[in-house]
């Protein structure tokens, strides 16, 4: 069955492509030269570590990792416990408060509990230089994450794609809407959230879709690992 495939199964060949090896080499060279690159090396592929291919129910596409100290840890929109909640995630929490009964905004921005339920939190570029947004946008990560989206499209069925903002929507243009459920809205950034992200109801609609397919809905209340044990 397709859902038994792992990321390793479907990405092993891609990871041997010259462009990908060049990307890794460029990032490694920058780190070795003393440039601070986020997230830390051990966290770059966390989205795949926490959400196996066969478990993917929802895909949320981010763009660049956060470029401030201690923020990025390999999951789009998420920050480690103890780090201030970034504005886009605060707006996501506002939308959840307004649409999910009983949701109360947590005091942290750590979304690992979403990832472990099957929400792939995928940035389209997986590294960034400290303080320099989009500094790694042309390194080859976009080619890799295009492949990831293509593989989900091909090997899974009935996945909900939440595409916020023009970048994510262009990235998701290849998704087969007969096989998957695609929801679009403006980005939750303070610059655009009032243009239709607020009120998009995506978190509710995603769960309704999953329930219609007989799948367990996502508990959108982010819990820290110690709280969920």
Curated annotation (Swiss-Prot):
The active site is at 64 (proton acceptor). The keyword Protein transport does not apply. It catalyses: Hydrolyzes single-stranded DNA or mismatched double-stranded DNA and polynucleotides, releasing free uracil. Disulfide bonds: none annotated. Its EC number is 3.2.2.27. Coiled coil: none annotated. GO terms for biological process: base-excision repair, AP site formation via deaminated base removal. GO terms for molecular function: uracil DNA N-glycosylase activity. GO terms for cellular component: cytoplasm. It is found in: Cytoplasm. InterPro entries: UDG_fam1, Ura-DNA_Glyclase_AS, Uracil-DNA_glycosylase-like, Uracil-DNA_glycosylase-like_sf. Keywords: Cytoplasm, DNA damage, DNA repair, Hydrolase. PROSITE patterns: U_DNA_GLYCOSYLASE. Belongs to the uracil-DNA glycosylase (UDG) superfamily. UNG family. NCBIfam families: PRK05254.1-1, PRK05254.1-2, PRK05254.1-4, PRK05254.1-5, ung. Excises uracil residues from the DNA which can arise as a result of misincorporation of dUMP residues by DNA polymerase or due to deamination of cytosine. HAMAP family: UDG (MF_00148). This is Uracil-DNA glycosylase. It comes from Escherichia fergusonii (strain ATCC 35469 / DSM 13698 / CCUG 18766 / IAM 14443 / JCM 21226 / LMG 7866 / NBRC 102419 / NCTC 12128 / CDC 0568-73). The lineage of its organism: Bacteria, Pseudomonadati, Pseudomonadota, Gammaproteobacteria, Enterobacterales. The gene is ung.
